[in-house]
């Protein structure tokens, strides 16, 4: 039986055992099954690390977005590259992702806000950064009171749902009865003219809180506290900017309402955001996408519990069915002239200084009542302390009854007016308490106190839609510390300023009305938090970086593609976005199309590079002097660096330009193996993320060892190594080492012999004969006849021994003294 058949038979038996365990009384977990399967695979044979290039894996990233636009105005083209006619979008099925992170860490929101600030600085570019109005002025305060006036309205507006004969709605107060009292200062000051010793007196108007006066001697407020810059031109703010990712990156977009209680599944991969609204406003977001349903997006740095609900901030996406809009206008009742000064500045002032020339009017149209009621219902889902009557839609009547039945109108008004709004009656910075917006390049600051007061009164059955506005020239900088001085309103008696803004978002925070926190109200956010206008768009996006290199254990046999793999080429033709289309598929099915997939990935990155380079070359003359031009070039370099880094890493592992690369590194973690039939690459990467560092180091070491072995093998097989035997220099070198070895042995022998001799001499006197021989001599005594002859011989022998002994002693003494010395 072959290895493959044995493997299949063991798998079959394993599945039978697991099935019986599940059917029995014992409960077996899924992890136990995976562990048993892993042990089975380990018993069958070793597994080795295999490198895959082109897997659908990503991680959150931070990089510069590319500013793209299809607008042809100069101020946009100097900062952005032209956008493409269309951008691809690919759905990613069977993938869940978390989109409820911190808003301040969302790269789309953060970069869109800074990009828009750069754009607005370009639109409203100051001439020079000096304090043009920091001079002594003589001013007189006047009050221009617009008494109670009636403003005819030709088209009635409702605040209910879709107008029909069966729905009751709030009637609209057609009379503008708000008293508008604005303090106005008529100021005179001198500037040096263009001629020598000539001065010119300037007379202009300032809003009451823009100047600080003592005895009619005034200076512009905050003159010594911040930088004041004068604007030189006007511009129109329109929807024209896209935020696009550089090559190698993708934006994930969630296509449903955000939910903190579960992961998001309806996800698609895109290259660019939707059009960003290039406007600056407070309280409301204008001219954005028409939302199908309401959605609350928290913008707090951290989640707060119910006990701190009054401190939370939100962005509410207003459903488009309510048709909320704000119409603003200013009559063409003034002219503007400019006066040059010796410093090169142009001071703009009006020809009619005695009148309040900067007033405008805005009208709130649409079904505001039901819109605020729907907001209350969304807040009630988060906190039960927000009381909402869910039966307000049950109030119905005919059209004639709706006009006559005032009691039913009052009941309907009380029903929907459960959410209170801060009416800004407390003292404070009036600029922060007024609704700010741009209207044809002018800065409108509108007082909405009367509107909020009418809404907070449950007995008021009518909707009051009017807000008086002031066109301000001195405005706080919303991006940094400082104040900007804008041009006076557009000149010309017949030049009316008109604009209509669709309300698509509301920006507010929760406040407690009493100390017991039983009642709460909302407070719209001031202009200092203009970054909130991008939360409604950016919260549904996540910037990620493609990680195309994957590592997984496989069998020793090289993975081969089936014969029909060419049919899958069309499924991944979208390049880098097509790579993510298989993110929810199993690892095995992705590996089948991996060759074409990785080729498509490389092709997609290269194609993005070509498109980006072509667009940058078209705008090179305009982009080279701007900061955004540098950022756009930097994004291209970043994407190239990432691609080269991946290829260098594959080269270190010996997997250059290989889609599936088998290695000799053993997979030691037998308890962690992929489920090729049901597990995705994203899930596998999450499980083995902590092993990546060790595996990559082992791959590098294994490839280095393989390279050394290959080099040594090549050396053995090289014929030139055998020819070195006939080289004379080679023989001389080894002969020299042989001579040194022989001389060393001889010297060692001499030293050992000398040491033995010295050691013997240092042992001292030793008897010539042994004790046994002396005993035998005494034991065998000779006869008397022989005694004399033996004694003579013995005497001679003793004398010789004494001489020898004395000689030895003298020699030992000499050697001892020599050794001591």
Curated annotation (Swiss-Prot):
Pfam families: GP120, GP41
Region (V3): 328-361
Site residues (Cleavage), renumbered to this chain: 569-570
Single GO term (MF): structural molecule activity
SUPFAM superfamilies: gp120 core, Virus ectodomain
Glycosylation: residue positions: 71, 98, 144, 175, 190, 215, 224, 266, 287, 333, 383, 389, 394, 423, 447, 516, 669, 675, 694
SS bond list: 67-80, 127-232, 134-223, 139-187, 244-272, 439-499, 446-469
Motif (YXXV motif): 765-768
Cytoplasmic side: 759-821
Residue numbers spanned by region MPER: 715-736
Region V1, annotated ranges: 139-186
Domain notes: Some of the most genetically diverse regions of the viral genome are present in Env. They are called variable regions 1 through 5 (V1 through V5).
Name of protein: Envelope glycoprotein gp160
């Amino acid at each position: 039986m072959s290895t493959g058949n044995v493997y299949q038979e063991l798998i079959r038996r394993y599945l039978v055992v697991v099935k019986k365990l599940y059917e029995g009384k014992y409960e077996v977990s899924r992890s136990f099954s995976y562990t048993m399967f892993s042990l089975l695979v380990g018993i069958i044979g070793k597994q080795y690390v295999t490198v895959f290039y082109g897997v659908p894996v990503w991680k959150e990233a931070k990089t510069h977005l590319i500013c793209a636009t299809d607008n042809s105005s100069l101020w946009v083209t100097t900062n952005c590259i032209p956008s493409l006619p269309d951008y691809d979008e690919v759905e990613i099925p069977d993938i869940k992702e978390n989109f409820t992170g911190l808003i301040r860490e969302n790269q789309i929101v953060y970069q869109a806000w800074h990009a828009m600030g750069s754009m607005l600085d370009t639109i409203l570019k100051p001439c020079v950064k000096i304090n043009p109005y920091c001079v002594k002025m003589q001013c007189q305060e006047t009050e221009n009171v617009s008494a109670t006036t009636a403003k005819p309205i030709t088209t009635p507006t409702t605040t209910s749902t879709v107008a029909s004969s069966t729905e009751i709605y709030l009637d609209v107060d057609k009379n503008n009865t708000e008293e508008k009292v604005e303090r106005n200062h008529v100021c005179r000051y001198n500037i040096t003219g263009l001629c020598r010793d000539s001065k010119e007196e300037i007379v202009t108007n300032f809003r009451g809180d823009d100047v600080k006066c003592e005895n009619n001697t005034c200076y512009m407020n905050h003159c010594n506290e911040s930088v004041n810059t004068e604007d030189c031109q006007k511009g129109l703010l329109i929807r024209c900017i896209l935020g696009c990712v550089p090559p190698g990156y993708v934006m994930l977009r969630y296509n449903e309402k955000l939910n903190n209680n579960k992961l998001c599944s309806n996800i698609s991969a895109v290259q660019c955001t939707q059009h960003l609204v290039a406007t600056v406003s407070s309280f409301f977001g204008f001219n954005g996408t028409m939302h199908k349903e309401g959605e609350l997006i928290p913008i707090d740095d951290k989640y707060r519990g119910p006990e701190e609900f009054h401190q939370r901030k939100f962005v509410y996406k207003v459903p488009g069915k309510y048709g909320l809009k704000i119409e603003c206008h200013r009559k063409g009742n003034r002219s503007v002239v400019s006066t040059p000064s010796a410093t090169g500045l142009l001071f703009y002032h009006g020809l009619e200084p005695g009148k309040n020339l900067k007033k405008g009017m805005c009208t709130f149209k649409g079904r505001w009542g039901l819109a605020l009621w729907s907001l209350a219902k969304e807040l009630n889902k988060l906190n039960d302390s927000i009381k909402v009557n869910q039966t307000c839609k049950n109030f119905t009547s005919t059209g004639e009854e709706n006009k006559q039945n005032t009691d039913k109108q009052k009941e309907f008004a009380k029903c929907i007016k459960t959410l209170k709004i801060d009416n800004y009656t407390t003292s404070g910075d009036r600029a922060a308490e007024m609704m700010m917006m741009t209207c044809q390049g002018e800065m409108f600051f509108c007082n909405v106190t009367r509107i909020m007061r009418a809404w907070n009164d449950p007995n008021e059955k009518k909707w009051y839609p009017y807000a008086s506005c002031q066109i301000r020239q001195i405005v706080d900088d919303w991006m940094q510390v400082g104040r900007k001085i804008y041009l006076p309103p557009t000149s010309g008696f017949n030049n009316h300023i008109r604009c209509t803004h669709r309300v698509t978002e509301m920006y507010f925070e929760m406040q407690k009305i009493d100390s017991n926190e039983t009642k709460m109200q909302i407070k719209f956010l001031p202009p200092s938090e203009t970054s909130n206008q991008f939360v409604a768009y950016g919260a549904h996006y996540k910037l990620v970086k493609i990680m195309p290199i994957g590592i997984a254990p496989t069998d020793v046999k090289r993975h081969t593609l089936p014969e029909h793999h060419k049919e899958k080429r069309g499924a991944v033709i979208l390049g880098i976005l097509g790579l993510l289309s298989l993110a929810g598929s199993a690892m095995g099915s992705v590996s089948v199309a991996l060759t074409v997939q990785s080729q498509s990935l490389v092709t997609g990155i290269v194609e993005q590079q070509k498109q980006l380079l072509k667009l940058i070359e078209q705008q090179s003359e305009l982009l080279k002097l701007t900061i955004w031009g540098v950022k756009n070039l930097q994004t291209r370099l970043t994407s190239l660096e990432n691609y080269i880094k991946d290829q260098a890493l594959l080269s270190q592992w010996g997997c250059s330009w290989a889609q599936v690369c088998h290695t000799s590194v053993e997979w030691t973690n037998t308890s962690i193996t992929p489920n090729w039939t049901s597990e995705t690459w994203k899930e596998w990467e999450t499980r083995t993320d902590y092993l990546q560092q060790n595996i990559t180091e082992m791959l590098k070491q294994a490839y280095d060892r393989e390279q050394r072995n290959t080099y040594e093998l090549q050396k053995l097989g090289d014929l030139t190594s055998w020819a070195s035997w006939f080289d004379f220099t080679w023989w001389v070198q080894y002969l020299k080492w042989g001579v040194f070895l022989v001389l060393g042995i001889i010297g060692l022998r001499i030293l050992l012999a000398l040491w033995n001799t010295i050691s013997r001499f240092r042992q001292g006197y030793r008897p010539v004969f042994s004790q046994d021989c002396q005993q035998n001599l005494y034991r065998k005594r000779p006869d008397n006849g022989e005694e004399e002859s033996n004694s003579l011989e013995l005497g001679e022998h003793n004398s010789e021994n004494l001489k020898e002994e004395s000689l030895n002693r003298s020699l030992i003494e000499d050697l001892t003294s020599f050794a001591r010395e």
